[in-house]
Amino acid sequence: MAKEKFDRSKPHVNIGTIGHVDHGKTTLTAAITNTLNTRYGTGAAVAFDKIDKAPEERERGITISTSHVEYETPNRHYAHVDCPGHADYVKNMITGAAQMDGAILVCSAADGPMPQTREHILLSRQVGVPYIVVFLNKCDMVDDEELLELVEMEVRDLLNEYEFPGDDTPIVRGSALQALNDPAGPWGDKIVELFEHIDTYIPEPTRAIDKSFLMPVEDVFSITGRGTVATGRVERGIIKVQDEVELVGLQEDSRKIVVTGVEMFRKLLDQAQAGDNVGLLLRGIQRTEIQRGQVLCKPGTIKPHTKFKAEVYVLKKEEGGRHTPFFDGYRPQFYFRTTDVTGATKLPDGMEMVMPGDNVTMEIDLIHPIAIEEGLRFAIREGGRTVGSGVVASIIE
């Protein structure tokens, strides 16, 4: 069967369901595909058990089960991720295996917010999920209007607690199961209403090409008579010949350099963009003054830092991680973009140790400054093998 051509005419948004176990995330995912297919004739209906049997994937050596479905509203194309287990969410969000432009928080009206409701909101805050829309599920089981209002208030308070705009967050009351059984009926209307909110409340993501230029340096060599060339894959933005860039990381001071040539597959170009593997010819810098692990970027857009807070997942023994816990002051290597830097870890107050399989918020102090920003992913390594995965939650200095 030939693959269908991906329709690029609609804006594309990545989304996912989050929330406590058994509050109806997977049922909602199935109901969405079914309802949008019934109402608009777009996409395909995906059955519950097909989503529930999520295939295992390995992302940076970590085993994660995730289901990917896609669907369309009249305005947009969505890629949606749903995870069967809580551990899969934690791993997924920390490794960035499934980047989310926004999330649908599913909360059962019958139970109200539960521990994982809170944990998923916190994780969303830490890993930089920018927008959350709430689906209050199982409303067919609750007759009491006051109870619904109470649950709604609790959810809003919880969102506020983790610095999401709880008071302005769209909350839709519905029943995923009823909508799945009768997508054309009144409960199906609730799914349509949910997506009217999502279409407007979750903005289109900025494409990598529209962001400020950044390229991690992978290799450096000098060409006699022409100068120094730095190679790497452009992470974001566009670079043109004669642009000024800044070299950031591994040294105290950043310095500005002019790009005098852009080369790709041995051909000279006027410009390169996000996703391209290129060599940049740099004027007035010696090969010894630039090294792997630094980044070239638009001047002033990123700074070198040594101290930051991170959300970390520690690999289990079965995933090739450590067999033993580690303690406060543990000093592994932190692998950012293209290089390892040693750093010391500081555990939260009152926490003695971290076991393989745990996720933890910790402070990290690197021995060299690195170009870091919130949302940047990294691996934790010991002697070249990955023992953990993390994401920068906030910069300290």
UniProtKB/Swiss-Prot annotation:
Residues 61-65 are annotated as: G2. Keywords: Cytoplasm, Elongation factor, GTP-binding, Hydrolase, Magnesium, Metal-binding, Nucleotide-binding, Protein biosynthesis. Its EC number is 3.6.5.3. Mg(2+) binds at residue 26. It comes from the Bacteria. Coiled coil: none annotated. NCBIfam families: EF-Tu, PRK00049.1, PRK12735.1, PRK12736.1, small_GTP. PANTHER family: ELONGATION FACTOR TU, MITOCHONDRIAL, ELONGATION FACTOR TU-RELATED. Monomer. Belongs to the TRAFAC class translation factor GTPase superfamily. Classic translation factor GTPase family. EF-Tu/EF-1A subfamily. This is Elongation factor Tu.
